[in-house]
Amino acid sequence: DDNPALAEVFEEAGMPLVRLFTPGEANKTLPLVKRIVSDIVDIGRRLRQMAATLGPNADEDEEVKRLLVEFQGVLREMEQLGCSYKDYNFDIGLVDFPAVIDGEAVVLCWRSDEPSVMYYHGLYAGFAGRKAIPEALLEPEEIV
């Protein structure tokens, strides 16, 4: 992880590099990541609903202020783990884990309706560019 050039590649893609993950390591964090994603989606939906109800003055509402602080806290938890939350529509939790596959800086990509981290994509490919993680990189119990 002490590769400054690699850190720069992730930084340029808007993803500060806290650590790199193997598919196995990403999957081991999932119980905690799932809890954090659940909190993010819940708070995000509540904020969106309150903004629609309260209109332009929503940011002055005490409950909105409290929720925003809570929201920033759970996002920070996610960042401290080294991964990034990606679904700000709050439809479904989407999380990227920085990784290197075949010498290329990529992100392992997990959706909250998936049982494990099974896909990855290039830093700029986005969700539409997802590919299956090569089986050789998965733990035997992760191969579906």
Predicted regions: what is each one?
Residues 19-20, 72, 102:
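A generic "functional-site adjacency" signal
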Residues 64-78:
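Short amphipathic alpha-helical coiled-coil/interface segments
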Residues 13-15, 77, 100:
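A generic structural signal for short, solvent-exposed coil/turn residues
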Residues 1-55:
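Long, hydrophobic N-terminal alpha-helical segment
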Residues 50, 54-57, 81, 85:
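Hydrophobic stripe of amphipathic alpha-helices that form coiled-coil interfaces
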Residues 83-144:
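Glycine-rich, aromatic-bearing surface loops/beta-hairpins
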Residues 58-62:
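Intrinsically disordered/linker segments and immediately adjacent domain-edge residues
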